[in-house]
Every structure is written in structure tokens, then in C-alpha cells.
């Protein structure tokens, strides 16, 4: 999982809805104690819908917090595979082939998106940048929290590392792959503490961090990495700089930076946007700037 070593698949989480303020139901006609499905059918009706409203909480989202939130792309899902990222699949395969491959589509209300849990690494107004796998906020390196792990290539002397030692270090043995040709492990997820322990093992020859640089180490990077545009040479390990929008802030809109803000303006803030003759129109009026109506946050898993 993307939070492995901090949180594990199967863990039971207790979530306070009062911390940041409880969100009022937007889809009140829901079967009690269900979220969006019961069996393979929706557990709610959209007959009654209300606007987004959140009551005041005890505090604000802060950098480093674990946050449970609705997956942003979860407003549209494939009925037969709701865990698949609809928008990434559409970009990768094309709409017609994707629908043929995955089947019918369901549009979900905002409060019925699947829940994700990640760590907040940037809040509204921050400028986020990832350089060789390290997070920087406003040009300053961010604290590396316990539990954050990166991927490493571990070369051995031709012998596998004793599984007992790997288990003691805290690695999930079922997820490890040993490549005889290397010889070694091409992708070991390690925290800083685990890294030092692996380096000290007698049959380890070298340990190198896996860094994804442009051109990306895997195909179709612009289809899987925000803002999903070939004009942005970003990868998961070298990303940004990206300014995180905050309520009331105004940004100049250009055709060059539009991919960064288009989905916020349309999907999250409910505006119509189009581009005609090289000009940007919002709600049928030409726009050279935009003022954000909400604060935004950047979440990231600890398993990086």
C-alpha cells in the first residue's frame, strides 16, 4: 500500500470528523453504515442533493497530518472496477477502447467518492517541489517523518539475503522480488532506519536509490503524472514546482499554466471553461486570471 510502514492494509483506523470540522451530508438518502456500495449496488439515492458545507472544526489541516479524504478522481468510476482510476485509463487507452475494456461508467456525488488516507505534505499557499525524491516546501527541504520509505536497488554477492534478516528489518517478504541477473533486489522499500540495517548485511554489495528522472523510466508518464501534459517534464521523483491554490488568491491564467488549474476551476469549483482561438473563457467570459474559492492541499503516501 502507499502508506506501508506507517499504516498497513487491514489496519482499523479511528478517524475524528471534528478535527477539521464535520462535512454535512450532500447525499442524505443513504443506507445507514454504508458509504457508496452494498454488495455490487449503490447504497444511496441522488434524488436529494445539497451543496457542500462543512462545520467549523477544532483546527486546520497541517503539514504532516494523516488525512482521510475523497479520492479527487473518484467522481467517475468503472462499475466493474471502481478501484481503477477512470481518468488515467481514459488518457492511456482512449475513451472508446477504455469503455469497451472496462464496461459501464458510474458518476458519483462528491461525498460518495472512495476514501483514501495519505499524509499532507503541502497546504494552501505552499510551493511544493520534489527533487530526486526529496520534498521541498518553499525551497526548503521538508522533514522526513518516521515511516517514510523510498525504493532502492540492493545488489548482493549472488546470494539472497536471509529471509529471517529481512523479516527482522520489517520488510514484507511476500512483496520482495529477487532478480538473479542483477543479482539482487531491484525495488526494496526502505525507511532511513531500514536502509542502514540493509547496508550492514554481509552479502550486500551496493545500495542505490531508485530515482525517476526525465525522460521518465516508464512509458506514458504524462498520462499518469499530474498535470498530465507533455509540456511538463515531471516525474514522480522530480516534480514541480507547483503552487498549491488558496482561497482568495488570484492567479494569472495562460495556455501554458492552464493544465495546472483547469480541473480545479471546473470540477471542484463548478465553472465552465473553454479555450477558443487561443483565449480562455470561464462561464462564457474571457478570463486572464482566476480567483480561487477554496483552499487546497497536496497529499502523498509514505511509501514513495
Q: Predicted segment positions?
A:
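Aromatic-capped interface at the extracytoplasmic side
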Residues: 1-3
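Soluble "head" domains of membrane/secretory-pathway proteins
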Residues: 9-304
Amino acid at each position: 500500500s502507499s502508506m506501508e510502514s506507517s499504516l498497513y492494509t487491514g489496519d482499523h483506523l479511528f478517524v475524528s470528523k471534528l478535527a477539521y470540522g464535520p462535512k454535512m451530508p450532500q447525499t442524505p438518502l443513504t443506507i445507514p453504515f454504508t458509504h457508496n456500495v452494498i454488495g455490487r449496488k449503490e447504497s444511496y439515492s441522488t434524488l436529494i442533493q445539497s451543496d457542500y458545507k462543512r462545520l467549523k472544526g477544532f483546527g486546520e489541516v497541517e503539514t504532516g497530518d494523516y488525512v482521510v479524504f475523497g479520492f479527487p478522481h473518484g467522481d467517475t468510476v468503472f462499475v466493474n472496477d471502481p478501484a481503477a482510476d477512470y481518468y488515467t485509463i481514459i488518457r492511456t487507452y482512449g475513451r472508446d477502447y477504455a469503455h469497451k475494456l472496462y464496461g459501464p461508467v458510474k458518476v458519483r456525488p462528491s461525498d460518495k467518492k472512495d476514501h483514501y488516507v495519505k499524509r499532507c505534505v503541502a497546504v494552501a499557499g505552499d510551493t511544493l517541489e520534489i527533487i530526486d525524491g526529496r520534498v521541498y516546501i518553499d525551497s526548503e527541504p521538508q522533514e522526513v517523518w518516521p515511516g517514510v520509505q523510498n525504493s532502492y536497488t540492493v545488489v548482493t554477492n549472488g546470494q539472497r539475503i536471509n529471509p529471517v534478516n529481512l523479516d527482522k528489518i520489517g520488510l514484507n517478504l511476500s512483496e520482495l522480488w529477487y532478480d538473479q541477473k542483477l543479482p539482487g533486489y531491484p525495488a526494496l522499500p526502505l525507511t532511513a532506519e531500514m536502509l542502514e540495517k540493509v547496508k550492514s548485511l554481509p552479502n550486500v554489495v551496493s545500495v542505490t536509490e531508485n530515482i525517476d528522472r526525465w525522460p521518465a523510466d516508464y512509458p506514458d508518464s504524462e498520462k499518469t503524472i499530474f498535470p498530465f501534459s507533455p509540456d511538463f517534464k515531471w516525474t514522480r521523483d522530480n516534480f514541480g514546482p507547483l503552487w498549491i491554490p488558496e482561497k482568495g488568491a488570484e492567479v494569472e491564467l495562460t495556455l501554458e499554466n492552464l493544465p495546472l488549474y483547469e480541473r480545479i476551476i471546473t470540477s471542484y469549483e463548478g465553472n465552465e471553461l473553454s479555450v477558443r482561438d487561443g483565449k480562455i473563457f470561464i462561464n462564457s467570459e474571457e478570463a486572464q486570471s482566476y480567483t480561487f474559492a477554496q483552499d487546497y492541499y497536496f497529499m502523498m503516501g509514505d511509501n514513495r
